[in-house]
Amino acid sequence: MSKLNIDLPKKPNKDFKVSSVFNIKSDLVVKGFENKTEWVPEIDSSYVFDEDTTLAVLAGFQHNRRVMVQGFHGTGKSTHIEQIAARLNWPCVRINLDSHISRIDLLGKDAIKLEDGKQITEFQEGMLPWSIQNPVALVFDEYDAGRPDVMFVIQRVLESDGNFTLLDKNKVLQQHDLFRIFATTNTVGLGLSLIHI
């Protein structure tokens, strides 16, 4: 995971006028970053922003609020968040919580590596600990499809000032001031909208 050892911006250093950047009626000005990094999504210049959803997501970025976007499958919920992050030059990581994602995928694992010609075991942090420690918008896609063991891990970071204990390293991680969490869901916790028997 050497790719995770990159320089990310430290503090927002640019003001963005919501009316001009997102083409919606608002006097709001939000903070973002001047420069784009490799973790910032590409801008889709043809994307049209829904006003209510955009303002809710911007509140998440500006005021460190946890925001969940609900809607039907394929309506662009995750893309909406990514396109806002793209325009704010905010590093963004999207994790799909399908049935294949595990605690180890999120938290990290021991890996064997060569050091001075010898094999050693070293813990490699997963995307969750890395994201928590950086100015990153973490998007949990299909939040309602997450496995229970994975959801217990995520529960620990839902509080805006919540510390995160990484048991594998006997380490307590403090959330970066600019770490943000978003989620998308199809069912708002109500289960499948249609069940075939």
Task: Show where each model-derived region lies.
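AAA+ P-loop NTPase catalytic core and its hallmark functional loops
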Residues: 2-195
